Amino acid sequence: YMDKEMLFNPINENDSPLEKDYQIQETLGKGAYGKVVKALHLPSREYRAIKIIDTRHMHKEDKLKIFQEIKNLSKLDHPNIIKIYEYFNSNRNIFIVTELLAGGELFDKIIDQQKFSEVDAARTMKEVLSAIQYCHEKKIVHRDLKPENILVEGETIKIIDFGTSRKFEANKMMSNSHGTPYYIAPEVLFNRYNEKCDIWSCGVILYILLCGLPPFNGRSDTELMENVKMAQFSFGKKFNHVSKTAKALITRMLTVDFEKRPTARDCLGHEWFSTKITDTPREISQGIIENLKSFNYKSKLQEAIYKFFVNQIATKEEKKVAALLQAGVTPGTDGDLQGAGQEPRRHPDQGGVEGGAARQRDPDERKRPGAALQEAGRQRLGRHRLLGVRGRLP
């Protein structure tokens, strides 16, 4: 199945046998419904990644979601976004060919290099926002921006994982919930949002880059998301070394009223990116790395625990559903978190709050970080993740 728009897109289905143009080298990662392999593209002699998705037991709707992701990503050609080359379709599999990204995830790379400054944060965020500005100009919203979906390839940032992306229309709200608890915008949880949900996620990422800890926490998944809805955060002592302009940008990006939240272009024009920033002292940098190491480790541990329990599910039907979820495909016709018949809830601050900036709470009110890093939990069940080619699968 392909629609007319896809047929005229330069990224088209390759009707030739895969083996004609590609020589499979090795398997990089496996999942319940697919695997990623490294392959040599014979005409160009360059290495690429191929995601092989077994579609024999997939519903038609799930296949359509795969093609929707291919369509969205094929519209994008930007140095900070993973590149898709082509795809193959057989009776058994869909083969999606992308550039091979050997670099690691953003946080892992920062931890490995043992040094990260505000100057580095500005350079990183500038590339992320540049990619998001490009996406939004193409009327595509990512909807699951987070450090795991930001790779470092050499000196270049690459955004991946467009499984939850979609086309949007100007001045038209979206209502289906997608995202990861730490980075999800409050209006998404209230099922009324626009493309600026990506800006909120960037604001959370920038906050973490500058101190190593998230602005919102909770002892459970539910508490975490309730805190996101309240949008109360603080800078406190851990931001004493951070410039006022950086904090001002974060405050703008975490504006509760998304209508008043800046666009990616607005953010890129912020004075923080043009102001000379004092280099972060080494002892402060080391503290950030230690915070980040703890946060990153617990996030990955929680994901591993989640996958373990998925594999222990008792019933055959539940295992079938879990396998789909592990492959990143949401079963059924609706892959959204919003329940059937659920009425969209309106954010209490939308249209009624003065000022619009996220309310900052007293630093002493903050709970200890890392107690409930649940990003692999309930929200992950709503994700449709197919093109995050990192040599491993969800």
What do the PLM-derived regions correspond to, one by one?
Residues 35:
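Conserved N-lobe ATP-binding subsite of Hanks-type protein kinase domains
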Residues 47, 52-76:
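Conserved N-lobe beta3->alphaC-helix segment of eukaryotic protein kinase catalytic domains
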Residues 87:
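Activation-segment/catalytic-loop signature of the eukaryotic protein kinase fold
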Residues 92-105:
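Conserved short submotifs of the Hanks-type protein kinase catalytic core
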Residues 124-125:
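Activation segment signature within eukaryotic-like protein kinase domains
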Residues 349-362, 385-394:
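Amphipathic regulatory helices of Ca2+-sensor modules
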